Amino acid sequence: MPIFKIRSILTALLCFQACLSGFAKIELLENNRVSFVGSGMGSRMVHYGHFETEIFLRYPNHNLTIRNLCDEGNTPGFRPHPSREQEGQYAFPGARELIHKNLQADTKPKGHFPTPEQWLSDLKTDVILCFFGFNSSFDGPNQLNRFKKELDAFLKHTKGSVYGSSSPQVALISPTAVQAIPGVTNGKYQNRNLKIYMNGMKEVAFKNKVLFVDAYTPSLNWYNEGKILSIDGALYNSDGYKKLAIFLANSLFKKSVINKKNRTKLHQAVMEKNFY
């Protein structure tokens, strides 16, 4: 095997190990109910379905239920929605005092849309995959310590809650880096903050003994391959989500793909489910 190929493989393996916090991977059991929470990176997965497909390919006989509760603008403590009362905008008790002060205003929302806690309980969630950090990173380094306190409180609350039959398994996934797109962005400013927040997330995850997946570092290597993986540098396209899906599934779960032949049909079924 050529030396450059060996080096590439070793680099990938080292990166893969470095991107995990060291805690055990998620062990999905039969009939487990999995919920995604977080902001844009997780929210946009519903449009492409690749990550869900990768999970089902690894656990074809587990009768899993997967629901995506992510939405752009969400933070660990703030989940805005105009159709629920003011206190329902916050993800857990005490969150209002921990979120950015600009998000603490009373906007007079009204309605009966379920709160984040109600969704997790109604879904009887056993496993929670958390996609936070991207929009928070735009607050800059000066807000990092506040964000870490918000994230720490969220993880402690989530790990101590019971939504299904027992406390949920929890994993935290960092944002990917911004890809340089000519005429749009070189990503340097955004990536400086994203790296700072990724490292902060890793610290908080380790403190709470939560599996952490660094998606920022490997994404930089993906961009070096020369393929456009995003529509504007930040928001992934289908190719970007395909690559991210395989990386996340390998990083989060113990099982590998059982039958790749079913990928296309399974992806079609996932997309039909997500349409409704």
Q: What is the predicted function of each stretch?
A:
Residues 1-10:
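Bacterial N-terminal signal peptides that target proteins for export
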Residues 9-18:
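Bacterial N-terminal signal peptides
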Residues 22-24:
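Boundary at the C-terminal end of the N-terminal hydrophobic targeting segment
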Residues 27-152, 162-169, 176-185, 268-276:
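Conserved SGNH/GDSL esterase-like catalytic core that processes O-acyl groups on lipids
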Residues 29, 46, 228-276:
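Conserved catalytic region of serine esterases and O-acyltransferases that act on ester linkages
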Residues 123, 157-168, 200-212:
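A structural motif corresponding to the C-terminal end of an alpha-helix
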Residues 142-150, 186-196, 232, 236:
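Alpha-helix N-cap and loop-to-helix initiation/capping positions
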Residues 180-215:
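Substrate-gating cap/lid alpha-helix
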